């Protein structure tokens, strides 16, 4: 009789609202989730009350603290702003890259068996990526880098991202079959809130420049939702034709595009704009669940 494999002990760094935990829930035991944002951690706690949640600054974390988690793998979703045009592409000179640099300085001393990282596509051409790969190779890791988008798996949301997987063991292959043939309506609220509607004056002034979608167009896909959605009008996501005008997508709809479960909850007092921010900052559970199969623990 085959013995059931024990769940991998995973340390979720820059955890946000818990995208990695959702993607890895069947095969991983998250021993701790770490983030600086207390608001993000409040969402994480609400949905995963049994997971230890730690709010501390990774820029100054010690090797002993990370070693004490005794994790088989580390998952990293570090800040993307240093590698985006809006973030001025300052790369490792950006102070928001300091936490990643600190973790990489510790890695040779702790060396988890596996490691995974997700970031914007611009990370692939960054000095941060070069440093990451250099450190991993010096520690003897096997490395796989890949660019993936939910549209590749049949999800109508364009969100291309850079992924890196590294392990001291053998790396596997990813199942690239489509998850499903989704349509736009599969992700929409049954009764959208009236507060999602764009004011008529905004539509009249900017409507032609906004990426708009017809919910009944089976070929339509939403643009990447950024953390600025709901705050910045342009270059932050798509808008939906609705009741003769346009409306924003709700945070719950964005989470459905990401693959979060229907049972996922927001703290009752958390405002709409902050929900948009956290949803836009999160990762694609759909994509990561497939991509994790590259690592030995998730085959």
Residue ranges of predicted features:
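Short beta-strand element of Class I
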Residues: 30-34
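Class I S-adenosyl-L-methionine
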Residues: 61-73, 80-231, 246-247
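S-adenosyl-L-methionine
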Residues: 42-68
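Conserved beta-strand elements of the Class I
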Residues: 9-11
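Conserved SAM/SAH-binding beta-strand->alpha-helix loop
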Residues: 37-38
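Conserved SAM-binding loop of SAM-dependent methyltransferases across substrates and taxa
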Residues: 17-28
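Class I SAM-dependent methyltransferase "Motif I" SAM/SAH-binding loop
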Residues: 13-15
């Amino acid at each position: 009789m085959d013995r059931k494999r024990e769940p991998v002990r995973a340390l979720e760094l820059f955890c946000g609202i818990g995208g990695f935990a959702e993607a890895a829930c069947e095969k991983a035991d998250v021993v701790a989730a770490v983030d600086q944002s207390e608001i993000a951690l409040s969402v994480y706690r609400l949905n995963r009350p049994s997971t230890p949640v730690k709010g501390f600054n990774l820029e100054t974390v010690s090797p002993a603290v990370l070693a004490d988690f005794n994790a088989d793998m580390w998952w990293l979703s570090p800040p993307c702003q240093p590698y985006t045009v809006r973030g001025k592409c300052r790369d490792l000179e950006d102070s928001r890259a300091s936490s990643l640099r600190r973790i990489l300085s510790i890695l040779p001393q702790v060396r988890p068996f596996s490691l995974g990282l997700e970031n914007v596509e611009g990370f692939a051409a960054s000095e941060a990526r070069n440093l990451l790969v250099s450190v991993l190779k010096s520690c003897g890791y096997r490395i796989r880098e890949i660019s993936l988008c939910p549209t590749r798996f049949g999800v109508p949301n364009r969100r291309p991202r850079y992924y890196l997987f590294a392990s001291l063991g053998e790396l596997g292959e990813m199942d690239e079959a489509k998850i499903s043939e989704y349509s736009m309506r599969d992700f929409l609220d049954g009764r959208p809130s009236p507060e999602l509607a764009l004011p008529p004056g905004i539509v009249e002034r900017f409507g032609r420049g906004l990426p708009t979608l017809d919910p009944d167009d089976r070929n339509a896909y939403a643009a990447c939702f950024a953390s600025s959605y709901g705050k910045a009008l342009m270059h932050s996501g798509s808008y939906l034709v609705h009741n003769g005008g346009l409306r924003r997508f709700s945070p719950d709809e964005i989470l459905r595009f990401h693959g979060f479960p229907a049972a996922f909850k927001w703290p009752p007092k958390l405002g709409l704009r902050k929900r948009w921010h956290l949803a836009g900052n999160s990762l694609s559970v759909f994509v990561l669940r497939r991509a994790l199969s590259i690592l030995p623990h998730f085959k």
